[in-house]
């Protein structure tokens, strides 16, 4: 994959970095070019045809549409691996996180086929993950035009600074992990959807190649894909910085855990590799 398939770190502005720090989310336009999108699209179709071991999916509650998701794709597909390791994304992550190094936590695929009306419930990501630390973010790259009626992500501005961890729940009747053990240190997610006016909700429409960048504690969710002919494909990469360490709290996603780490260990390993600076 050519380096210029992903935007250069030099294109990042101080406004984007401050927006990420203040709101917990920002957008990079034209983050991935048409060549990179074509490579990702081919890899996504291959995963749909022959899913990896961490596939999770469901049919729409209304009987039409389908959701396809997967985790840790980089471990068995060279295209995803190149995006995670060899693109400028790790260096861009270092800029947002103000970190001297960047580890790859994992990558993830989200495909809402046309007519998949299920909402993605409001949540923040880090309670699902076996890590602790402040320097944690995700890139969510759009492969299709994304609008409110096709499932654009919505974010609660500033929620990454609430210092609140919400109880993980499964996202529909999936083929993946279907329940999470209750953690007494977590709290239930407020009923944001029925009290939207009480929150500052921010969202952006995306074109193919645009990307959301958001903190691991930013509360977010999305609507269903109401289009009958347009898919909503998103590819996410999760990176961590200097202060992230392994932490298996009650209620984390077992598919993201490591057999060789114990709580408090730094992540650096084949399982959570250092991807910047490149070795």
Which stretches of residues belong to each language-model region?
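A short beta-loop-beta micro-motif enriched in histidine and acidic residues
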Residues: 97, 124-136, 199, 206, ...
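Short, solvent-exposed loop/turn segments at secondary-structure junctions
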Residues: 33-34, 110-112, 127, 146, ...
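Short, conserved beta-strand element in jelly-roll/cupin
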Residues: 130-148, 205-208, 213, 238-241
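Non-heme Fe(II)/2-oxoglutarate
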Residues: 2-5, 50, 54, 58-59, ...
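Double-stranded beta-helix
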Residues: 148-219
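Non-heme Fe(II)-dependent double-stranded beta-helix
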Residues: 1-23, 28-122, 127-130, 257, ...
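Short, charged/polar surface micro-motifs in flexible loops or helix N-caps
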Residues: 89, 99, 114-116, 146-148, ...
């Amino acid at each position: 994959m050519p380096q210029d398939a992903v935007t250069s770190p030099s294109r990042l502005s101080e406004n984007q970095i401050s927006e990420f720090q203040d709101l917990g989310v920002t957008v990079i336009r034209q983050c991935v070019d048409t060549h990179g999108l074509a490579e990702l699209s081919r890899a996504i179709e291959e995963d749909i045809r022959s899913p990896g071991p961490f596939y999770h999916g469901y049919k729409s509650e209304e009987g039409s549409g389908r959701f396809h998701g997967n985790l840790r794709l980089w471990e068995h597909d060279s295209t995803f691996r190149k995006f995670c390791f060899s693109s400028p994304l790790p260096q861009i992550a270092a800029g947002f996180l103000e970190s001297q190094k960047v580890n790859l936590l994992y990558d993830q695929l989200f495909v809402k086929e046309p007519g998949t009306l299920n909402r993605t419930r409001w949540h923040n990501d880090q309670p699902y993950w076996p890590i602790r630390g402040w320097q944690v973010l995700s890139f969510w790259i759009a492969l299709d035009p994304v609008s409110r009626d096709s499932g654009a992500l919505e974010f609660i501005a500033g929620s990454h600074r609430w210092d609140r961890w919400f109880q993980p729940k499964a996202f529909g009747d999936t083929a993946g992990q279907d329940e999470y053990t209750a953690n007494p240190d977590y709290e239930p997610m407020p009923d944001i959807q029925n009290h939207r006016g009480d929150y500052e909700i921010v969202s952006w429409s995306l074109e193919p190649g645009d990307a959301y960048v958001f903190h691991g504690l930013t509360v977010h969710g999305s609507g269903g894909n109401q289009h009958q002919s347009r898919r909503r494909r998103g590819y996410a990469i999760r990176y961590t910085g200097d202060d992230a360490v392994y932490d298996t709290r009650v209620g984390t996603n077992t598919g993201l855990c490591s057999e060789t780490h114990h709580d408090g260990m730094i992540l650096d390993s084949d399982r959570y590799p250092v991807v910047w600076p490149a070795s």
